[in-house]
Amino acid sequence: MKFNITSFWLHIIAIILMTIDHIVIIFIENENILRAIGRPAFPIFAFLLAEGFYKTKNRKNYFIRLLILAIVSEPIFDYVLHQKIPYWFQQNVIFTFLLAFCAMTLIEKINKDRIKTTIIFFASMIVGFLTMIDYNYIGIPMVLTFYIFKEKTKLNLIAQISIITILSLLLGGQTLFTLGQIKIPDEILSLLALIPIWLYTGKQGLYNQWIKYFYYDFYPAHLVIIYLVSRFF
């Protein structure tokens, strides 16, 4: 049986996993092991951003849409997850994507020069740490991994597995299991995202203006809905 996954289905998978993650945070607790279910969501969104960067017809408009979404989502993100507006110690994930967008633009301008690209890759970890964006110092590099190692070759697949494993171990999280004295965090489940990503056909799939804006509006909207349900039910 052959599975053909389009961009539409990648979005749906990531949205479902992200929603589960946020339900656990809001209804149970931030440090609950059930959050492991949602770990593959971010790598899928990271891949979709890199793919969108390649395929969009108008990068300026793409960037502006992300910027507006980041600004609109921030007070919602701050209040729902931190009960404080403003909360300066963690910015929502759309800001992570904005900075990754800038990093990809820089890499494109240097024609993917290996040395300069490597410098940008590691510099992005510092930027992520200093700006306190969601996913901290691994967020931007995760997007860049899919941008730099885009083609479906064996070497690129090995690179994706290796880098995502390292980034996941660096970020940590709740202990999923132990290997001797080594604690393996639940972030390692981010690797599962590679299954639907590798099955991606390169096609957009179901798409229209309603779906386009659903992708953008869902992020702040689902936070509001989950929060309201948690307060009144």
Regions found by a protein language model. Give the residues of each.
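Alpha-helical transmembrane segments and their immediate juxtamembrane cytosolic regions
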Residues: M1-F233
